[in-house]
Regions:
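Extended, small/polar residue-biased N-terminal targeting/export presequences
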Residues: 46-107, 153-185, 526-531, 536, ...
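Bacterial Sec-dependent N-terminal signal peptides
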Residues: 1-25
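Conserved functional hotspot residues or short segments at active or partner-binding sites
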Residues: 345-554
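Cleft-lining beta-strand/loop regions that shape enzyme active-site pockets
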Residues: 18-31, 35-52, 107-111, 115-124, ...
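Polar, glycine-rich mid-to-C-terminal structural blocks
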Residues: 292, 304, 311, 315-376, ...
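Short, solvent-exposed loop/turn elements at domain surfaces
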Residues: 28, 44-51, 66-73, 102-106, ...
Length: 554
């Protein structure tokens, strides 16, 4: 009895944390044993022979999927995908391909500048017939992309059919290591002497590319700078810190990482003298601005070094590291949260890992208040909230269908390919526009093609009719429903006229890309960009710019 009492007292004296660790380790060991035994039984007794790579790989991926979208297992065959994500580089030919619904075939959509595809002479619309003798008819874009990639220095034969002539053309192309997208696909001086830099991602040497662009434009006398981080999904924290370092003094904390293990804790501090601490700066952001882009915009906001303009960012405030696995696999693992200089964690979603898993969106009502260097107040509401909110124009439904984002008769693609074939040259990227005659020709082709699309208003009306029937009001309101239905019927010609400005600019951007590549397309798009226009307006109003960066009087 005394021995039992002593054991109970000893157990009671054990630190709670130690007991929890012991229970946790026991649960881990038990579940690993169960998993191991289950697979042994499957391998030994299941009616069919199993592919261990597929079955175990699916089990691992399902387990990680229950945690968060960023913790991912890469088998040996998938490691190149991870490497491309980190470096921005891959070995291939450098072009965007897309699925043509009409031809049921992959086609060239956009060769990238200074890559093997552009140097070989491939054009938008070229139909990919075969790769090294293997027919590509009916093969999806993933399959075709995998065959376009390979080892650096390897040569292959590509056969395409050019729509303008109907003839097949053979190309011998040598693969090489190239950037998936340039870090800075476009920069240039805009109206009023304002510099503009489009930053597509934070990959190797992104900071150097931004520095080169900025220094060149500053030599030409710019009076302000716009850095465009819209649709920038992030990348390297170090590259983000290095870009911030261009505009803030040495020795400033840009971002701090905190995790379960000490090895996950890391602070990024500006380590060099800046190149400019006074140039007025506007950073453009939107809902697809994420991760390292939010580190950069959050730091500049906390230092009151620039004005953030656009819409609230994505809210990815967690970071990952990569770990080597047996047999040349790798694990990208979420290990920490990161915090802006003022201490904000901008993670928008909390991932729950118990009771089946769920996600919780951060609530504005429970958010804490943080202060910038000048004393401006911001809350950790999830994402970076812009200093000035400016919403971009939304894409109308008809434009979405014309762009072949869903099943399409390819009338837009065919028009663009024909236009390019008829015009060996066009006006400079920043000046090119379709004439009213050109747009009318496009409109007539759409009408003649039998183009159809779903209008959201018709969908909502159908849903409302079903609800009215369910609640017993439909018969009473039948005539009103029928009248509204007649008014909402498809009128493609009317919709093409009503949305002419948006559709026309969409076509212009596509056509310009065929002549001046991605940088030309971006330059062309800036003419009709509401958020860029607001940024230019702000940078030409010094008093308002300074006022925004001062704290509000209470």
């Amino acid at each position: 009895m005394k021995k039992l009492l002593f054991c109970l007292l000893l157990l009671g004296a054990m630190p709670v944390g130690a007991q929890e660790d012991k229970d946790h380790n026991l649960n881990v060991a038990k579940n690993l044993d169960v998993m191991n035994v289950i697979y042994k039984y499957l391998d030994m007794m299941y009616v069919d022979t199993l592919d261990a790579n597929e079955v175990v790989g699916n089990a691992i991926r399902s387990m990680l999927k229950s945690l968060d979208p960023y913790t991912v297992y890469y088998s040996e065959s998938d490691v190149n995908e991870l490497r491309t994500m980190i470096t921005g580089k891959y070995v291939g030919v450098g072009m965007l391909i897309r699925w043509n619904f009409q031809l049921r075939n992959a086609v060239v959509d956009e060769p990238y500048e200074n890559t093997p595809s552009a140097e070989a002479g491939l054009k938008k619309g070229d139909v990919i017939v075969s790769i090294d003798g293997e027919p590509m008819k009916g093969k999806d874009t993933k399959y075709v992309s995998e065959r376009l990639r390979g080892d650096a220095g390897s040569t292959f034969e590509l056969v395409v059919r050019r729509p303008s002539t109907g003839k097949q053309m053979k190309f011998k192309i040598t693969r090489r290591s190239i950037y998936q997208t340039p870090a800075v696909p476009y920069y240039g001086i805009q109206e009023g002497g304002i510099g503009y830099i489009n930053l597509s991602g934070f990959v190797e040497n992104s900071a150097k590319a931004v520095r080169r662009a900025y220094v060149e434009m500053r030599r030409k006398g710019i009076r302000g700078l716009i850095v465009d981080l819209r649709n920038n999904g992030g990348g390297s924290e170090q590259e983000a810190a290095d870009i911030v370092n261009m505009f803030v003094p040495k020795g400033r904390l840009v971002v701090s990482n905190r995790g379960k293990l000490k090895r996950a804790n890391h602070d990024y501090i500006t380590g060099m003298e800046p190149i400019d601490t006074v140039m007025p700066l506007v950073v453009l952001v939107n809902g697809n601005t994420a991760s390292a882009s939010e580190i950069m915009s959050g730091a500049l906001q906390d230092f009151d070094r620039g004005v953030i303009l656009g819409t609230r960012t994505y809210g990815k405030g967690i970071a990952q590291m990569t770990l080597d696995l047996p047999y040349n696999g790798q694990l990208k693992l979420t290990t920490n949260k990161w915090y802006t200089p003022s201490g904000r964690c901008i993670q928008a979603i909390t991932y729950k890992h118990a009771r089946g898993g769920s996600t919780v969106q951060k609530s504005d009502s429970t958010a804490k208040v943080f202060l910038t260097a000048h004393g401006r107040e911001f809350k950790d509401v999830g994402g970076i909230v812009p200093d000035i909110e400016v919403k971009a124009d939304s894409l109308p439904n008809i434009a979405y269908y014309l762009a072949a984002a869903v099943d399409s008769n390819e009338v837009l693609h065919n028009y663009e390919v024909d236009y390019i074939a008829r015009h060996p040259t066009i006006a400079p990227a920043g000046e090119f526009s379709l004439s009213d005659t050109d747009y009318e020709e496009f409109k007539q082709r759409v009408m003649a093609s039998g183009f159809k699309y779903d209008r959201e208003s018709e969908k909502y009306l159908e849903n409302l009719k079903e609800l009215a029937k369910f609640e017993g009001y439909y018969d009473e309101a039948r005539s009103e429903f029928e009248a509204l239905e007649n008014k909402l019927k498809h009128n493609v010609a009317k919709d093409l006229d009503y949305n002419k400005r948006v559709i026309k600019h969409m076509i212009e951007n596509d056509i310009v890309a065929a002549y001046y590549y991605q940088k030309g397309s971006i330059e062309n798009s800036l003419r009709d960009d509401k958020q860029v226009a607001e940024a230019l307006k702000l940078l030409n109003d010094e008093a308002k710019y300074r006022e925004i960066l001062r704290p509000k009087k209470k």
